[in-house]
């Protein structure tokens, strides 16, 4: 007799198989597609999280998972790297121009907002790709376009804020 005990979503279900003994032999759900290569192949990678469908056991592990997401975005997403380097350049310029702490904080927050939205965009694109696979769906396009639009609007706002806070001191240096 087989039964499925859903945890939070179909992809995070625990599958139990009760044999003649009546004891449940729990097996874990299959790993997400594209993350695991058979170990027999050279250069095979182990999954980042063996039990990815489980909640992190402690806060340190949660931080490690979060940092893995940031590292993944930095390694794979060109736009995330551009936003990161731009943010560092803006904060460096603000420090060199001796801007007030509140101005530096506003610049840091707007830069971080763009990077946060880029992380959310990457996550949403991954989930949409996992859901629709290689097929085209108009709703998938809308979801991806809206997420990219959110990043675009945040980037435009960051440029405006950066211009308002950095241009006056830069212009005063040129005069």
UniProtKB/Swiss-Prot annotation:
Membrane topology: Multi-pass membrane protein
GO biological process: phospholipid biosynthetic process
Residues annotated as catalytic: 118 (proton acceptor)
Keywords recorded for this protein, A-Z: ATP-binding, Cell membrane, Kinase, Lipid biosynthesis, Lipid metabolism, Magnesium, Membrane, Metal-binding, Nucleotide-binding, Phospholipid biosynthesis, Phospholipid metabolism, Transferase, Transmembrane, Transmembrane helix
Top class in the EC scheme: transferase
Spans through the membrane: 55-75, 96-116, 151-171
Gene Ontology CC: plasma membrane
Cofactor(s) for this UniProt protein: Mg(2+)
Enzyme Commission identifier(s): 2.7.1.107
Pfam family membership, one: DAGK_prokar
Entry's Gene Ontology molecular function annotations: ATP binding; ATP-dependent diacylglycerol kinase activity; lipid kinase activity; metal ion binding
Binding residues for a divalent metal cation: 125
Location (main, coarse): membrane
Catalytic activity: a 1,2-diacyl-sn-glycerol + ATP = a 1,2-diacyl-sn-glycero-3-phosphate + ADP + H(+)
Compartmental location: Cell membrane
PANTHER family named in the record: DIACYLGLYCEROL KINASE
Family as reported in the entry's similarity comment: Belongs to the bacterial diacylglycerol kinase family.
Record function comment: Catalyzes the ATP-dependent phosphorylation of sn-l,2-diacylglycerol (DAG) to phosphatidic acid.
Protein name: Diacylglycerol kinase
């Amino acid at each position: 007799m087989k039964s499925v005990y859903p945890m939070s979503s179909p992809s995070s279900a625990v599958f139990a198989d009760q044999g003649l003994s009546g004891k449940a032999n729990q097996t874990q759900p299959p790993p997400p597609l594209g993350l695991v290569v058979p170990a027999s192949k050279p250069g095979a990678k182990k999954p980042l999280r063996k039990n990815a469908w489980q909640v992190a056991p402690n806060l340190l592990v949660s931080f490690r998972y979060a940092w893995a997401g940031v590292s993944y975005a930095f390694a794979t997403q060109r736009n995330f790297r551009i936003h990161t380097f731009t943010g560092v350049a803006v904060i460096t310029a603000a420090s060199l121009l001796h801007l007030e702490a509140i101005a530096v904080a506003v610049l840091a927050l707007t830069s971080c907002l763009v990077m946060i939205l880029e992380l959310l965009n990457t996550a949403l694109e991954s989930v949409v790709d996992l859901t629709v696979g290689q097929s085209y769906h108009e709703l998938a396009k809308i979801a991806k376009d809206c997420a990219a639009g959110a990043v675009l609007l945040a980037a435009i706002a960051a440029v405006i804020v950066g211009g308002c806070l950095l241009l006056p001191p830069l212009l005063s240096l040129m005069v």
